[in-house]
UniProtKB/Swiss-Prot annotation:
The gene is der. This is GTPase Der. Associates with the 50S ribosomal subunit. GTP 2 binds at residues 211-218, 258-262, 323-326. Residues 381-465 form the KH-like domain. InterPro entries: G_ENGA (IPR031166), GTP-bd (IPR006073), GTPase_Der (IPR016484), KH_dom-like (IPR032859), KH_dom-like_a/b (IPR015946), P-loop_NTPase (IPR027417), Small_GTP-bd (IPR005225). One of its GO terms (biological process) is ribosome biogenesis. Gene3D superfamilies: 3.30.300.20, P-loop containing nucleotide triphosphate hydrolases. It comes from Agrobacterium fabrum (strain C58 / ATCC 33970).
Length: 476
């Protein structure tokens, strides 16, 4: 991307709507409730012939630095410092407010390029707000409607004028780089099943961080990044959008998704929280590995267990992070107790990697990242058909399938049909009669003998064709 644009303004003027319009996707949550956006969210934007990075920010309201509003203000100021040009969005329909004037003064003092955007200009009565905006001293407002896509050509021209054509159209950017970048195929899609089985360490690893509210998810990511990139604090439920950040760990690109804390469904009543949870679920489905953050001081709440079960059912690789380990007394005894509870309460994820750590102090972060990499490798594991059939023969010899209606079931052949997660197909007689207990026996054997702890393992059955079956029925 050639340059960076920050979108700022007071709450509820349409910043996230404009952000979604420019990135061409509904990435940012949009609601009539003021103050939906809290963290700064980057995205790849396209506006006519411009390609740039755009940053959505929280609605600016001045407050003390120790308050939530004050910390949101600091995040927005960081976005302005990072950007080459700022889009200052006002609500032309509502007109100027003292908050707009305060923000305008702050932007003037910074001396960086600013484009004044009069949003909602399609509404009746917006003319007065448009002309009032001249008093901000930031030049002629650019009238747009982010919701309806009006005024985008004028906005493009205003951005080019603000930063200059040299920055808007750098000579070293070729045509290939200005194409729209489509997202990679999501895990589990038909296209991905044809991928080479070799584990590719050059590809970015997508990791979602989930957990109950106030488990320390954003603090953990900030510690990884080494900066206060995400908004944190003692208040539960600060994060609303799923925010993605990229960084390198020992030469491997990691793309992490911070998500909103997820409570029990019965407690989620507000529309905005439902939108946040839906956004978190999308991040889980798009991730490869999911880190479930537990609060070590109150681990294994019912919601914690349900989140692990959700990740396993979605077929994602899972790692447990026992956060706030700095608050634990007698860590050795407590860790032994946690491991016992993990095996007992999470039988569907037997052997799952669990790491004690502290986002506050940085304790255990390297072990957590290594566990994420190791789990992802296991999730991508492929086993040769020859090894699988030798293993199947040994398993059925040691513990033969049960007899159903007086006839013993026969498992004849086994192959791996896909990875991510590992899935196997067994050719057998009467697949519908295989009991669930025998499938669990096979899954546990695969997990143990092929060293696949903690990842979902799928076993499917199909009937083996008998070419003489129809003739046998006729003789009867």
């Amino acid at each position: 991307m050639s340059f960076t644009v920050a979108i700022v303004g007071r709450p509820n003027v349409g910043k996230s709507t404009l952000f979604n319009r420019l990135v061409g996707k509904k990435l940012a949550l949009v609601d009539d409730t003021p103050g939906v956006t809290r963290d700064r969210r980057p995205g790849d934007a396209k506006l006519i012939d411009l390609r740039f990075t755009i940053i959505d920010t929280a609605g600016l309201e001045q407050s003390g630095p120790e308050t939530l509003q004050g910390r949101m203000w600091a995040q927005t100021e960081a976005a302005i410092d990072e950007a080459d040009v700022t889009l200052f969005v006002i609500d032309a329909k509502a007109g100027l407010t003292p908050a707009d004037e305060t923000l305008g003064e702050m932007l003037r003092r910074r001396g960086k390029p600013v484009v004044l955007v009069a949003n909602k200009s399609e509404a009746r009565g917006s003319d007065a707000g448009f002309y009032d905006a001249f008093t901000l001293g930031l030049g002629e407002p650019c009238p747009v409607s982010a919701e309806h896509g009006q005024g985008m050509i004028d906005l493009r021209d205003a951005i080019v004028e603000a930063i200059g054509e040299d920055m808007a159209f750098p000579p070293d950017v070729d045509e290939a780089e200005t194409d729209i970048v489509l997202p990679r195929t999501e895990p589990g899609s038909e296209e991905e099943e044809d991928e080479e089985p070799v584990y590719d360490e050059t590809k970015p690893l997508r990791v979602a961080i989930i957990g109950r509210p106030n488990a320390g998810k954003s603090t953990l990511i900030n510690r990884f990044l080494g900066e206060d990139r995400l908004l944190t604090g003692p208040e539960a439920g600060i994060t609303r959008d799923s925010i993605s950040v990229e960084w390198d760990w020992r030469g491997r690109t990691i793309k992490m998704f911070d998500t909103a804390g997820m409570r029990r469904k019965a407690k989620v009543t507000e529309k905005l929280e439902k939108l946040s949870v839906a956004d978190s679920l999308r991040s889980i489905r798009f991730a490869e590995t999911v880190v479930i953050v537990f609060d070590s001081t109150i681990p294994f709440e019912k919601q914690d267990l349900q989140l692990v079960d959700l990740v396993i059912r979605e077929g994602r690789a899972a790692v447990l992070a026992f956060n706030k380990w700095d608050l634990v007394e007698d860590p050795q005894a407590y860790l032994a107790d946690l491991r016992e509870k993990t095996e007992r309460l999470l039988p569907q994820a037997r052997g799952i990697r669990a790491v004690p750590m502290s986002g506050q102090t940085g304790y255990g972060l390297d072990r957590l990242m290594q566990s994420i990499i190791d789990t992802d490798k296991t999730w991508n594991r492929r086993i040769s058909t020859a090894k699988l059939n030798r293993w199947l023969d040994a398993q059925t010899t040691q513990h033969p399938p049960p007899a159903v209606s007086g006839r013993r079931l026969k498992l004849k052949y086994m192959t791996q049909v896909k990875a991510r997660p590992p899935a196997f197909m067994i050719s057998c007689t009467r697949p519908e009669a295989i009991p669930e207990s025998y499938t669990r026996y096979l899954v546990n054997g695969l997990r143990k003998d092929f060293d696949m702890p903690g990842v979902p393992i799928r076993v499917h059955y199909r009937g083996s064709d008998n070419p003489f079956e129809s003739k046998a029925k006729k003789r009867r």
